[in-house]
């Protein structure tokens, strides 16, 4: 908390149009004295009149990895916007405000703390995620770089857990979202549904033990992408692919793969591999081509061999949406919402 506040006061507040800063993400669920999970960073949201003045960044301060994300002050103009947007409602309800020169964040905190768990707003946030998934459109096909097919599939599967986590009043933006949704489903009497969600990502016949060799390829492409330079310097997620973040991006994923619920590692393997390939696509297409067989091998291990398989996974996700809705209603009913 102190390092994040020092960062907000010492650096971010110097930028024009600064309106405040607060903590977000999984750190808000920790009790006093709890250690931050290995591989996690501390999310610091910086509010500006124009968020374009400050770039999204990751940097180490006092042994903590801070992820700084700018947001527009307009997002906090009224309680309704905050309460219907999960990542705003969760953070404002918890109210870990670092700096609030205008008093706006404190006001939104008081409103969110009172209303964010009401049935109306739980359902509105749940419905927002379901709408996002149902309107995701046709995923890019073979005329785009392979990583551009991987990203919407992997993130779509991850977001499929969000309506359920939202209904249970849990944070969605957690590193181990499939583990989190498994705990919720177990608690609310629907344990069998977890396998339906994870299958969107892993397929039905994946072999967790066989993922280890793909971790070696992920490590290699990460190191190669870290060493590249060129147009990717201006890409938003380039700050995620740096030598200083090796343990966060690769080491933490390897530890999850070796845990009792390795499905969460698959999401991060795909997301990180795709980001590394985007860096190489921008900077060094020869290196990108050299790692393409490794990405194809990882996809094949998950049952993805071409465009038809991506399309089938999207259809599988769309078909599951009514059941996700039904599960969330069951959870809300049990919670008296």
Regions found by a protein language model. Give the residues of each.
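Metal-dependent nucleotidyltransferase catalytic core
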Residues: 1-19, 26-96
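Short N-terminal helix-initiation segments at or just after the protein's N-terminus
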Residues: 6-11, 95-106, 212-217
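Short hydrophobic/aromatic-rich motifs at helix boundaries and adjacent loops
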Residues: 16, 27, 105-112, 153
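Short acidic/polar alpha-helix capping motifs at helix-coil junctions
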Residues: 18-21, 146
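Noncatalytic linker/hinge segments flanking ATPase motor cores
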Residues: 60-67, 84-91, 107-113, 198-207
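Internal, well-ordered alpha/beta segment that forms a basic, Gly-enriched binding/recognition surface
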Residues: 73-141, 147
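Conserved nucleotidyltransferase catalytic core and NTase-mimicking acidic/glycine-rich helix/loop elements
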Residues: 122-337
């Amino acid at each position: 908390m102190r390092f994040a506040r020092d960062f907000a006061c010492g650096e971010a507040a110097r930028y024009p149009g600064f309106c405040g800063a607060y903590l977000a993400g999984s750190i808000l669920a920790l009790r006093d004295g709890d250690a931050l999970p290995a591989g996690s960073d501390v999310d610091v949201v910086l509010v500006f009149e124009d968020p374009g003045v400050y770039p999204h960044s990751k940097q180490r301060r006092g042994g903590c990895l801070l992820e700084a994300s700018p947001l527009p002050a307009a997002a906090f103009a009224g309680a309704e916007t905050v309460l219907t947007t999960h990542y705003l409602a969760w953070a404002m309800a918890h109210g870990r405000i670092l700096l609030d020169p205008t008093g706006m964040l404190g006001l939104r905190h008081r409103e969110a703390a009172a209303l964010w768990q009401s049935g109306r707003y739980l359902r509105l946030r749940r419905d927002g995620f379901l709408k996002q998934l149902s309107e995701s459109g046709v995923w890019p096909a073979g005329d785009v770089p392979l990583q551009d097919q991987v990203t919407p599939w992997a993130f779509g599967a991850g977001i499929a857990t969000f309506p359920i986590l939202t209904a249970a009043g849990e944070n969605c933006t957690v590193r181990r979202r499939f583990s989190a949704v498994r705990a919720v489903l177990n608690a609310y009497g629907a344990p069998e549904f977890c396998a339906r969600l994870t299958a969107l990502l892993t397929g039905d016949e994946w072999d967790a033990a066989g993922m280890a060799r793909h971790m070696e390829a992920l490590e290699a492409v990460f190191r190669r992408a870290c060493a590249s330079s060129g147009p990717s310097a201006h890409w938003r997620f380039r700050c995620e692919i740096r030598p200083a973040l090796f343990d966060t991006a690769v080491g933490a994923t390897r530890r999850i793969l070796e845990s009792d619920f390795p499905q969460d590692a698959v999401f991060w393997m795909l997301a990180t591999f795709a980001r590394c390939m985007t860096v190489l696509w921008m900077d060094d297409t020869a290196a990108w081509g050299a790692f393409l067989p490794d990405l194809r091998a990882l996809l094949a291990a998950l049952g993805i061999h071409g465009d038809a398989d991506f399309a089938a996974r999207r259809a599988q996700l769309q078909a599951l949406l009514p059941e996700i809705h039904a599960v969330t209603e069951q959870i809300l009913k049990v919670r008296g919402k």
